[in-house]
From Swiss-Prot:
Involved in the oxidation of myo-inositol (MI) to 2-keto-myo-inositol (2KMI or 2-inosose). GO terms for biological process: inositol catabolic process. SUPFAM superfamilies: Glyceraldehyde-3-phosphate dehydrogenase-like, C-terminal domain, NAD(P)-binding Rossmann-fold domains. It is an enzyme of class 1 (oxidoreductase). Keywords: NAD, Oxidoreductase. One of its GO terms (molecular function) is inositol 2-dehydrogenase (NAD+) activity. It comes from the Bacteria. This is Inositol 2-dehydrogenase 1.
């Protein structure tokens, strides 16, 4: 079965998804796109193929009988309405993170999906598909390092874009760590503390950057997360699980080592798109395969809600540096235990 995919949003992420679906994912065919910028949307549609339809209204794309499944890569504030429309239409949707702008918005998506009685939403936390993270989880689950006691995480961007708000180090950057930590440890984050560090002179005046977060899980594991969105030298994500018997860390994502001039070195990725290109492709492939089977896989709407709830707790915690509890609603049976 070929899954006919519609893509809402053709900015950087949406256009990348269209290209990946067209050239790197088996069993999928992009048949429609939508974007508020009609010129950009039509250009991406034309690049994807002569038969790709452009919809000015994303709701029309979702309702198109020729579309089997939808990727939502539009601005964050549109996610709730579009993901909900997909659920109501009974169509699988891969929604870029964050699932919605607030935890309350995410919870409404969860409620719609529960009322529908089946999972249709996959939240776009692609790190769960990254081969290095998958290997880390496999090692932990196999007992290779014993029970986990600590996790060390680093999330560095070369520089924050002009639209980066003071909330986005938590809601746009560290939210990936919140999701992947929950997944790696199979445990909810229950408490957060945000430490203010000396701010980089390279950071915009409105940003306190970097930040150091300390997370505590329901199982008692402590996680430290460095978030530095103006690190200058490149895009750098690191993770180390410390267990009672050993440790496991992300492998360096480079394929070559250059030795010259008395030095040895590897290239650092410029941004997340190159570092996680394969993770994005594997995420889309898994989503398409699941849609073809009439199933859902990967991060759920509940996972999207939980990660956003942790981000909101961090926003509260940064005010005075004291620990803040993460408050979650009761988890519906649809999402397992």
């Amino acid at each position: 079965m070929t899954v006919r995919v519609g893509v809402v949003g053709t900015g950087v992420m949406g256009a990348d998804h269209v290209r990946t679906l067209t050239g790197g994912v088996a069993g999928a065919r992009v048949v429609a796109v939508s974007d508020a910028d009609q010129g950009r949307g039509r250009a991406v549609a034309a690049e994807a193929g002569d038969e790709v339809v452009f919809h000015a209204d994303p709701v029309d794309l979702i309702g198109d009988a020729g579309v089997d499944a939808v990727v939502v890569a539009s601005p964050d504030h549109t996610h709730e309405a579009l993901a909900t429309a997909c659920v109501e239409a009974g169509k699988p949707v891969l929604c870029e993170k964050p699932l919605a702008a607030t935890a309350a918005d995410c919870l409404r998506i969860v409620a719609h999906e529960v009322a529908k009685g089946r999972r249709l939403v996959q939240a776009g936390y692609m790190r769960r598909f990254d081969p290095s993270y998958v290997d880390m989880k496999r090692a932990l689950d196999a007992g290779s390092i014993g029970d986990p006691v600590l996790v060390h995480c680093v999330h560095r961007n070369a520089r924050a874009l002009h639209f980066f708000t003071p909330e986005m180090p938590f809601t746009s950057a560290a939210v990936h760590e919140f999701d992947v930590v929950r997944w790696l440890l199979s445990s909810e984050i229950v408490r957060v503390t945000v430490h203010r560090t000396r701010s980089s002179s390279r950071a915009a005046a409105r940003l306190a950057d970097p930040r150091l977060l300390v997370l505590e899980t329901a199982a008692g594991v402590t996680v430290d997360v460095e978030v530095f969105v103006n690190a200058q030298y490149g895009y750098d994500v690191r993770c180390e699980l410390v267990g009672e018997l050993g440790t496991v860390s992300l492998a360096l994502p480079s394929t070559t080592v250059v030795r010259a001039g008395g030095a040895e070195g590897v290239a650092v990725h410029a941004d997340f798109r190159t570092r996680f290109a394969e993770a994005y492709r594997l995420q889309l492939q898994a989503w398409v395969d699941a849609a073809a089977r009439g199933e859902a896989c990967g991060p759920s709407a509940w996972d999207g809600y939980a990660a956003t709830a942790v981000a909101e707790a961090c926003l509260r915690a940064q005010e005075d540096g004291t620990p803040v509890e993460v408050e979650l609603a009761d988890k519906p049976a649809l999402y397992g235990t």
